[in-house]
Design a protein with these regions (language model features):
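C-terminal and inter-domain tail/linker signature
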Residues: 2-24, 68, 75, 82-86, ...
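Short, surface-exposed "cap/lid" segments of acyl-processing enzymes
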Residues: 23-74
Length: 257
């Protein structure tokens, strides 16, 4: 590499992403701003199961929590837990609308990691389908018929186990079965049934499904990589190198967007 690449953001060397802590919106609803150097991104609502650890943290052994992982992807995240009230989806939407870092605000996504929460939230999601333009739901294969009848939002279904009949996708939906696992909590970090490789596959599928419908966020990954490798291997500036990386890289090189 002969010369410094174009700076990914601004006209100066990279600076670390400012630490962000989840902010409580109301009981059971938290807001986490984008953990990206860009600093803003579209809204993502997460329906998450309870964290049963005695001392919950956002990252453990290099594995981020659900909300942290999506914030590192550049989204502004509103997370809903089971102890939230019946108005949680609207409260989460309001928090995103009021957040300066949530931009644009007209196309938001939703991911459900807890089917009990989906049952409580489906009608609210449907009432906001002009704003919630895409969704993904993790469930058991046997639950597909029930949950798919509750929404008209374009949805990707991640199904644990093998269904007895062939699942058919539509113009507005995609269906993936994960026959090697029986638990729909396989994507939930810190759970006994968490399976890293399977979660990674489903996460990549979510990104491919969500980004065209939410108009991003898109990043110049080649430029980000060139900037990162320049500071590590040519400039050899530790501070600037670390500023191009996520908080706790889980492989040798994980540039932050």
């Amino acid at each position: 590499m002969a010369a410094i690449p174009e700076f990914a953001y601004g006209s100066s060397p990279p600076v670390p992403v400012a630490p962000q802590k989840p902010e409580q919106v109301t009981e059971g609803v938290t807001l986490l701003r984008p953990l990206s150097r860009r600093g803003h991104g579209p809204g993502m609502i997460i329906l998450a199961p309870n964290d049963e650890r005695a001392a919950p943290v956002e990252i453990q052994d290099g594995i981020p929590s659900l909300r942290m992982k999506w914030a590192e992807e550049g989204y502004c995240v509103a997370e809903i837990r089971p102890n939230a009230s019946s108005g949680a989806v609207k409260a989460a939407m309001q928090a995103l609308e009021n957040c300066a870092e949530c931009e644009p605000k007209d196309k938001m996504g939703l991911i459900c990691y807890d089917t009990d929460l989906w049952s409580k939230s489906a009608s609210a999601v449907e009432s906001l389908k002009d704003r919630i333009v895409v969704a993904a739901i993790y469930a058991k294969a046997s639950q597909l018929k029930q949950i798919s009848s509750q929404t008209s939002v374009p949805t990707m279904y991640h199904l644990a186990g093998k269904s007895e009949t062939k699942s058919t996708a539509t113009a507005n939906s995609k269906i993936y079965e994960y026959a090697t696992t029986e638990s729909s909590s396989f994507p939930v970090p810190f759970y006994e049934d968490f399976h890293y490789a399977t979660e990674a596959v489903s996460h990549s599928r979510n990104l491919a499904f969500f980004k065209p419908r939410m108009n991003g966020p898109y990043f110049d990954l080649e430029l980000l990589w060139d900037e990162h490798t320049y500071y590590e291997f040519e400039n050899r500036n530790v501070e600037h190198t670390m500023a191009t990386m996520v908080e706790e890289p889980y492989v040798n090189h994980v540039p932050t967007v």
